[in-house]
Amino acid sequence: MSKADKALLIVDMINNFEFDMGETLAKKTEKIVPHILSLKEHARQNEWPIIYINDHYGLWQADIKNIQQECTNERSKDIITKIAPVDADYFLIKPKHSAFYETALHTLLTELQVRHIIITGIAGNICVLFTANDAYMREYSITIPKDCIASNSDEDNEFALTMMENVLFAEITTEEQIIEK
């Protein structure tokens, strides 16, 4: 059981990047990995649950090893090697864009007594935004470290951050600011 009411969500970071603009997103994702890893270490030190929630890539299995194997290629290998979950982390699969849609995430967060989520991952303008929207609908407090999300374009990422701040009342911050609190 968590000692805090916060949890770190890591969305879709186990990814094959084999889609339109996948190469662009992979390059942007490489830049956020160190920030997410730093935040992950901070979460571990503070005993916050670390929850990976990921696309299933047609496998429909919550077996992280199979998903990692399915996603590993020249474009994704370095990212997956660095960011992969460890045994102490939670791992859930999702069928669509939101981490809440048709998943056990809300039940898990309730069981862990989490009321504040820090959302990281990709793509900021799709899966992170939809997850933040559904978190808002469930009355979670939301923090988005802007150096821990990436989208296909900087404009799309900025638009998503603006929406999350102005419509979903998410706190937009940085990994460093979260650690300094």
Curated annotation (Swiss-Prot):
InterPro entries: Isochorismatase-like_dom, Isochorismatase-like_hydrls, Isochorismatase-like_sf
Record keywords: Hydrolase
Transmembrane segments: none
Keyword Hydrolase: yes
GO molecular function: hydrolase activity
Highest taxon listed in the record's lineage: Bacteria
Similarity remark: Belongs to the isochorismatase family.
Protein name per the record: Uncharacterized isochorismatase family protein YaaI
Top-rank EC class of the record's enzyme: hydrolase
Pfam family for this entry, one: Isochorismatase
